[in-house]
Amino acid sequence: MKKFASVLVQLKTLALEKIEQKLESKRLELWQNEREILDKQAQLSAFKNPELGGMSLFLQIQQLKSALRMEIEYCQQEGEDLNKDLKILEKDYFLANQELEKAKIILENEKQKEKEILEKKEQALLDENAMILHWQKGGLHA
């Protein structure tokens, strides 16, 4: 049973590490997404409506601004999805951590049982040796 508990702890630890890697990856992806949103917002605010240049330049700038707004909306939606994924992963991490702690407790209990069994065996051997010595002493006096 101790071997099983030990393997269980190893598996739970690996599962936890895998979730940690996914969490780190999602956090990085979210950070990049937020950075992209800020860049696009900066680009959008850089566009000024031309006072000169006519209607065609005005329309081109409006189209660019519209395209940037759509990209920002897409990035923001992507950010919301990443946040949802992150929350799910954080919950998975919490549950995996709980499972790991349970597995560690099982392993500790098994180690304690094994220790108690060894102590009982040692005591039985000591008792047996004491009896043998007692019999030997009794045989010498007779």
Annotate each PLM feature.
Residues M1-A142:
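Charge-rich amphipathic alpha-helical interaction elements
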